């Protein structure tokens, strides 16, 4: 499932990003090993991370393209509801899964290294989709992630 900067244009502002962030559901060390093997077989070099880490980074060996595979997203509970809310989008002729706008907002706010750009990203999604988002779901997930107060502040700023 596409997350991060590449997911943003589907819901908010278009901006450049240096890497591709993908979230994968990996529930066991065995699944992580199988996923890692498949990524390496597809030409990605495992650069960092293990099953217990939030992030496992793989790089395309021939192009230097950086693809980050997130096995535990900040602020998002991996459950059937999260997966059911993802959306199917088109990207370069491919049909891909993209994180829901509500979950994208929560992941941006729950990052331990959250910066000004993350908050700008959240504002852009809110400006574009505020009336069509599931407000109850967004608030519940923000509360679960401990970022509800921050969301309130961002929503109150121009």
Regions found by a protein language model. Give the residues of each.
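Compositionally biased terminal segments of proteins
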Residues: 1-158
